[in-house]
Amino acid sequence: LAKGVEKDSLYTMSEIIRDVLGNQAKIVALSGPTHAEEVVRDMPSTIVSACDDLEVAEKVQNLFQDTCMRVYTNIDVRGVELCGALKNIIALAAGISHGLNYGDNTRAALITRGLSEMTRLGTTMGCLEQTFHGLAGIGDLIVTATSVHSRNFKCGTLIGQGYNVDDATKEVGMVVEGLNALPAAMQLAKRYDVEMPITAMVDAIVKGKVSPNEAVKALMNRDRKTELTKSVADISFENSIIKSKRGLGMKRVITYGT
């Protein structure tokens, strides 16, 4: 099992495999909110089978689908893989907020705005927005940023409590994937000119450039933003077109901002 983004090539795991085996290789990415501790106890779980060949994704879907595991298909392999890497960084941020004794409001804000960062980067790289709003995106993010099983959340909590990164990692006792994902995430953000303030602050904390408290202040004191990427006039115009064509009343068209 492997996931993440290689920091030198910035390839996802499937892209590395394809680079070795060639374009004829049929590669499936499995991802979603599936902590092993619950899967082995046959607790109902859901996952995504992603392949650019839908028939292959469906074959894997049929292999894994049973009464305790529901499998959905997706053709956005890169998007699914990016979700699996980036959500660990946001989980670190959520853990840091927990270690600072902040509450549910703060964690909800980090999850929501963290998802916005993930989506911005992914769509700029050609991934599907729906992928980030599905099981591999928000689904896995919620689990990783809230669960007691999450190594990333636990490591973040320790950092928020004052541990340095090395000691926090040793205390967790396993690989903390969010730490490994940070270099590639920062490089991708720079390459595609995408603003990722939460990711950048986690990176600064890990590198010892700012304290967790300083990072919180920096995030809260950023320039004021709108939650929408489209202007109110554009949204109103689109809604009026939808209304006139369908005659079904106003349907809101909303997209995520920075």
Predicted regions and their residues:
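Conserved hydrophobic helix-helix packing surfaces used for dimerization/oligomerization
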Residues: 47, 252-253
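General beta-strand structural signal in soluble alpha/beta enzymes
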Residues: 26-31, 71-75, 196-198
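Conserved N-terminal Rossmann-fold NAD(P)-binding element of oxidoreductases
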Residues: 256-257
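Internal alpha-helical scaffold of NAD(P)-dependent oxidoreductase catalytic cores
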Residues: 16-24, 44-131
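Short beta-strand segments
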Residues: 1, 28-31, 48-50, 93, ...
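Rossmann-like NAD(P)(H) cofactor-binding subdomain of soluble oxidoreductases
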Residues: 1-44, 60
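NAD(P)-dependent Rossmann-like dehydrogenase/reductase catalytic/cofactor-binding core
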Residues: 87, 94-98, 123-133, 139-250
